[in-house]
């Protein structure tokens, strides 16, 4: 069973575009992780291994276009290749939802990105749903409910 500690989306310029923490940490610990990992991963060459060790856990990352998807995982429990597959499935799901997702989609629609992520990964960092079709169905239902709620507010 996969147990994620955190997921970060970082641009090539080193700006955090999205972060989700699945393990309780102090603000200082979170800031240190971001501060340490961002330049380390950005400096790595494309042909280098996508798995690095950091303190007490492993970090798996993958670059898609101008974004780095960085995942911290528990070393004893997790499978690094499964974590890479989770990253890929997350990107595929966003790509289907947004239609060729880009960094601006994530910036301007971050709440939808969090919805997709929350449908895929539970709050403790374990996988909730791996089917892209199911995740998209749930997010679409949420969109419909949200638009109906907004319509009711306008009409009342």
From Swiss-Prot:
InterPro entries per UniProt: AP1_sigma (IPR044733), AP_complex_ssu (IPR016635), AP_mu_sigma_su (IPR022775), Clathrin_sm-chain_CS (IPR000804), Longin-like_dom_sf (IPR011012)
Cellular component annotations (GO), alphabetically ordered: AP-1 adaptor complex; cytosol; endosome; intracellular membrane-bounded organelle; nucleus
PROSITE patterns cross-referenced by the UniProt entry: CLAT_ADAPTOR_S (PS00989)
Record's subunit section: Adapter protein complex 1 (AP-1) is a heterotetramer composed of two large adaptins (gamma-type subunit APL4 and beta-type subunit APL2), a medium adaptin (mu-type subunit APM1) and a small adaptin (sigma-type subunit APS1). AP-1 interacts with clathrin. Also a component of the AP-1R complex composed of at least APM2, APL4 and APS1.
Domain of life according to the entry: Eukaryota
Subcellular location: Cytoplasm; Nucleus; Cytoplasmic vesicle, Clathrin-coated vesicle membrane; Endosome
Other comments on record: Present with 6370 molecules/cell in log phase SD medium.
Function: Component of the adapter complexes which link clathrin to receptors in coated vesicles. Clathrin-associated protein complexes are believed to interact with the cytoplasmic tails of membrane proteins, leading to their selection and concentration. AP19 is probably a subunit of the Golgi membrane adapter. Component of the AP-1-related (AP-1R) complex, an adapter protein complex that mediates sorting of cargo SNARE SNC1. In contrast to the APM1-containing AP-1 complex, AP-1R is incapable of sorting CHS3.
Keywords recorded for this protein, A-Z: Cytoplasm, Cytoplasmic vesicle, Endosome, Golgi apparatus, Membrane, Nucleus, Protein transport, Transport
Major location (coarse): cytoplasm
Record GO terms (molecular function): clathrin adaptor activity
CDD domains hit by this protein: AP1_sigma (cd14831)
Organism (species): Saccharomyces cerevisiae (strain ATCC 204508 / S288c)
Top-level taxonomy: Eukaryota, Fungi, Dikarya, Ascomycota, Saccharomycotina
Family, similarity comment: Belongs to the adaptor complexes small subunit family.
Record GO biological process: Golgi to vacuole transport; intracellular protein transport; vesicle targeting, trans-Golgi to endosome; vesicle-mediated transport
Pfam families listed in its UniProt record: Clat_adaptor_s
Protein name: AP-1 complex subunit sigma-1
